[in-house]
Amino acid sequence: MNRRTGEQGPRRLPLLVATAMGLVAILATFLVTREVSGGSGPDCGVRLEVNSSTEKGDLLVELAQKYNASGRELADGKCARVTVSETSSGVAMDALAQGWDEKRDGAPEPQAWTPTSSLWLTLLTEKGTTSDRTVLTGDKPVSLATSPLAIAMPRPMAEAVGWPQKKIGWRDILSLTEKGWGSLGHPEWGRFSLGKDNPHTSTSGLAATVAAFYAATGRSSDLTLDQVTDPKSRAFVSGVEAGVLHYASDATAYMANLAEADAKGQALSYASAVTVQEQLIHLYNQGSPTGDVKLLGKGKKPKVPLVAVHPDDGTLMLDHPFVVLPSASREQRAAAADFSAFLLEAAQQRRFQQHGFRDHEGNAGRELAASVGLPDEGKRKLSLIDPPSAQVLGAILDSWDELRKKARVLLVMDVSGSMNQPAGGGQSRMEAAKKAAVAALGLYHPDDEVGLWAFSTETADHREPYREILPPRPIKAGKNQLVTSINGLSAEGGTALYTTVRAAQQAALSGLDADRINAVVVLTDGKNEYPADNDLDALLRDIDATQLERSVRVFTVAFSDQADFDTLSEISAATRATSYDARDPAVIDKVMVSVISNF
């Protein structure tokens, strides 16, 4: 787990961090933890650990510092010291459902939790029905702030659809997915492409999936199981999903890629629209595409801003609930109540607004209204839908697993000699990597296609540094053969990373299926050790998605502390993908789960 501790420590790293060389990516579904201390001093005997969703984690860190320094007292005269850790909502929900484990989950066990939406409370409650533990106290949650789900679009594209005069909804997204931009007089923009997160881990992905099902039925409340399983509803949602570029576990991945394209004067070349929390659109327009609040108003603003389109056929208000957990003692419950009351005071609510949130009553600040193009300064009524029941929400997630856009993935595994080195736990890196790769096969949909390559350098048995072992084929037909082939890999030779990445992407391009998410996943424990192809700049030019008419994303996984993570990050960023950090081999299984969430 990637952990940040201490008030003076480094800031949270976002999923993609802009650098002069490109975008450096880190694993978003891993916990990023930061504890803060304030001026209340060592006499504060009540310690409260709050776990926050990532998009407001920076702000809660700031406000916890302010609270700790405020000198506030609880009813019994004691004072509390609040510390904050931050975790994506879906990951935190799973941790709470299993029973929080600090070592496994990478953060202290919280006594209070504030996810992005009460949808996660609904899912956690449902999971708790099969457990002998109490997962929630039953207390009514307090909303700290709000932010509606919105469709972020580059302004020229939104205007081409009719924004802001015309009401735009999910049916317009479906129509554009089917007909492309040529239907609106812009064939130069090509296909309509949608950025959307995985609903199992991301609130915006979950909310967008729920909203699409509601739009399919024309309802705004009381969605039923029969309506979720109705063939017409499923066809509608499947049609929306067909336009997805690829799935992600954090919407900042899309925002970072948009910012890079914008910086190169190609803002309309990447995604036509991204389903996100409205607040992230504000951050993007204010120069912070990755959500780093230090850049808010100071980072480079985009040449082509995004506007917030609120679907007229239904969207959800994300309510940022604050709940006390069963792990809290009586004193911690009192501290949680006082901290939440502090957060609802006018000064703190104003800080939420300045960061692009609406206040807990749904009122937009002037900064947000101007930044994202809210009609009537944000006073126009939104077409809000009611959150579905736990049973229906579970059915929506199950349906998405079937209806989502399917993938065509080429898995490229490093079999260089260094993979024989120990990885801990009595196994080699090769053994740990094979185990993780085999386990990951169970995360794909049966209709997803997966192929396998291996690479090192030339050996006595192989005249090329890379070799195709199995071409992509559906998991339902080829899983057993993939398992056998992965388990049969052996390690020798050096690491011909650059030439393999280039060849793998070209192979994926030659077999490109436009109706699928096409991707390459490279797992390596080292750095390039191949003199015949040792020019990183040339590789980055060859795979640069902004310079190619067609491109395939290359997701990289750094496996071992010898892996060249910076270079792997540049490779992935050049293809508008993500690099994942598994330099601690103990986390490789969780890393692979995160990788597969892109598909």
Regions of interest found by a model, annotated:
Residues 2-22, 26-32, 323-413, 431:
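Extracellular/periplasmic juxtamembrane helices and adjacent flexible linkers that interface
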Residues 403-473, 500-501, 519-524, 556-559, ...:
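Von Willebrand factor
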Residues 211-308:
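Ligand-binding pocket segment of bilobal, Venus flytrap-like solute-binding proteins
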Residues 135-151, 234-248, 295-328:
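Periplasmic-binding protein-like
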